Amino acid sequence: MSDVRSDKPFVLAGRTFESRLLVGTGKYIDMEQTRLAIEASGAEIVTVAVRRTNLGQNPGEPNLLDVLPPDRYTILPNTAGCFDAVEAVRTCRLSRELLDGRNLVKLEVLADQKTLFPNVIETLKAAEILVKDGFDVMVYTSDDPIIARQLAEIGCIAIMPLAGLIGSGLGICNPYNLQIILEETKVPVLVDAGVGTASDATIAMELGCEAVLMNSAIAHAQQPVMMAEAMKHAVIAGRLAYLAGRMPRKLYASASSPLDGLIK
């Protein structure tokens, strides 16, 4: 019998997903590249900036849902571009109208244009309103374990701390805070922002994150479709490594083969 820990399902808002890679839809050169990259990623959940993307609110313009049909993908509307709770709540309510009453949203309330750090005070306000309004809230936040705990206590269904600045590609800047969040939070934790290449995604999964969300790392790669496939395998590898359990770190060497019984 294998001693590898068996995996548990990845569940969000009562739905089970096979892929632990979530992807965004921005920054691609056109919708065809968007479609090809997302197909290559194997992602089932696709996040969309409601304020920047036509989901049917602008008749006559290309509709992203024609390329990424909701019967194939779970569309996760997000509040990118919102800088206070009022804007974010309004955007979530618009998304519910556009997506036939679906309540799953990704909340992000930004502090400024330069850093795109989350405004945690406004995020907490918006989260409380949205949860009371019946939304299933996945929330972008800082890597502060106390804020993460408060958001979970409000009723957010997933906590999404940044690993680095949005679009920076800096990788996992503070794995220690992420570890604390993972230990202290009882809802799924997904790394959101900062991933730059496949090894970053693997590290996030090895830490124990339920999943990883990314956009720039794929869309800004020299070959986005190829990078999307790389990220697919990176997330799988990281999850398997987490379940298997890494060997302990040691200060000194340890021979792979025993020294007893050597031929003399």
From Swiss-Prot:
Catalytic center residues: K106
Protein name: Thiazole synthase
GO molecular function: thiazole synthase activity
InterPro entries given in the database record: Aldolase_TIM (IPR013785), Thiazole_synthase_ThiG (IPR033983), ThiG (IPR008867)
Function recorded in the entry: Catalyzes the rearrangement of 1-deoxy-D-xylulose 5-phosphate (DXP) to produce the thiazole phosphate moiety of thiamine. Sulfur is provided by the thiocarboxylate moiety of the carrier protein ThiS. In vitro, sulfur can be provided by H(2)S.
Subcellular location: Cytoplasm
Lineage of source species: Bacteria, Pseudomonadati, Pseudomonadota, Gammaproteobacteria, Pseudomonadales
Entry's EC annotation: 2.8.1.10
SUPFAM superfamilies xref list: ThiG-like
BP term (GO), one: thiamine diphosphate biosynthetic process
